[in-house]
Amino acid sequence: MLLLLFKRKPDLKKFLHLLGFCLLILLGLVALAGALFGYFIYSPEPALPQLSGTLTKGAIEVGGLKRTYLTYVPRGLPQGAPLVLVMHGSGEHAAEIRIGTGYGFERLADEHGFAVVYPNAYTFDWNDCSKVGDFSVNGAEVDDVGFLNVLVDKLMAEISVDRGRVFATGVSAGGFMSIRLALEAPSRFRAVAAVAANVPTPENFKCTPAGQGTSVMIMNGTDDPLVPFAGGEVNLLGLFYKGGNVRSSRESGQYFADRNQLTGTPDTKSTAVADGVSVEQVLWHKAAKNMAANSTAANNTDANDSGTRAEVELVAIHGGGHGLPQAYWRRPRLLGPSPMTPDGPAVIWAFSHDSDPEPGCVNDGVR
């Protein structure tokens, strides 16, 4: 019987039909994968704007590790100009956050006269306040706070930025790192803006907050599929990038308001900025009588002394997803809705630059 099977001639025609069918299935799967990638993940890069300044690469050694960064300095930047740190998300680098912000901070730097630095994380992620995550190299946690402090000192010496006007912001993992700076290095940063990030819950919290505070903005989308606006576990589709539990965005704002001793009722303003998109601003600040009583200390950045600068603002993008809204680049659909307004970089700069902003409305992203 076996000999008969081996002697039987193969049916070449059937074999070719089967092979063709398999190839069609394979091509269909490839086409489907390409379509899914194009729809959910691919997003064309924005055009590089005409900028006045120069972008340079830099490196320093901190804690035995080589740390790298990009610096943008506008043409004719005067001495004593502000400095803005912009931190990237997980698995990204400085080049990606430039794209992710639509080069918005460099556009603003040209207009308002400040320097921008984009530091790179050493590992896959920034070593933020979350306990969940891989932040170790050779058995020791990476000291990202130390790196950023050394970087600021280096830039102060090289481009003569104003020590009293250093601001920090970041998106996603960079936003979580911004929260750590606000807690552990508040005296070094006049204001901090965390985007697509919330304060970790107590069981997922490892930071040691300093005694004083600084102004903090939290900007989150209500439809963020990765960092839940209402609080809960940080993850993507329940499968990827699990980062532990976080507080809600409102609770995160209240957390910093309590730290900054802002006990009054916050001011709230809601503004429609596009079809299906509205911006809710919740601003915690000192009561008018306390501000008047401390008017002689208006230049003091310590929240426990005057509080005139230690405000807290939650910017809730209703109808927004995971990332910083701006007009020049749409984020991948996998990260949720990507509204082109408000102008996130402009909102952050207005909050950071204004030492004691009054409650206001969002007008195309500018307070």
Residue ranges and their predicted role:
Residues E106, N149-V152, G253-A257, W349, ...:
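Non-transmembrane alpha-helical segments in soluble domains
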Residues H318, A327-G344, G365-R367:
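C-terminal/domain-terminus segments
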Residues S136-V142, G238-R247, L335-P339:
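A short acidic, glycine-rich active-site loop
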Residues L85-G89, A196, N220-G221, H318:
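The conserved beta1-alpha1 loop
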Residues E280-K286, T308-L324, Y328-R330:
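Mobile gating loops/cap/lid regions near enzyme active sites that modulate substrate access
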Residues L2-L83, L108-E111, A140, T169-A193, ...:
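A domain-start/cap signature at the N-terminus of enzymes
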Residues R190-A274, W284-A288:
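The feature captures the conserved acid-bearing segment of alpha/beta-hydrolase catalytic domains
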Residues I60-V73, Q79-F167, F176-R180, E184, ...:
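Serine-hydrolase catalytic machinery in alpha/beta-hydrolase-like enzymes
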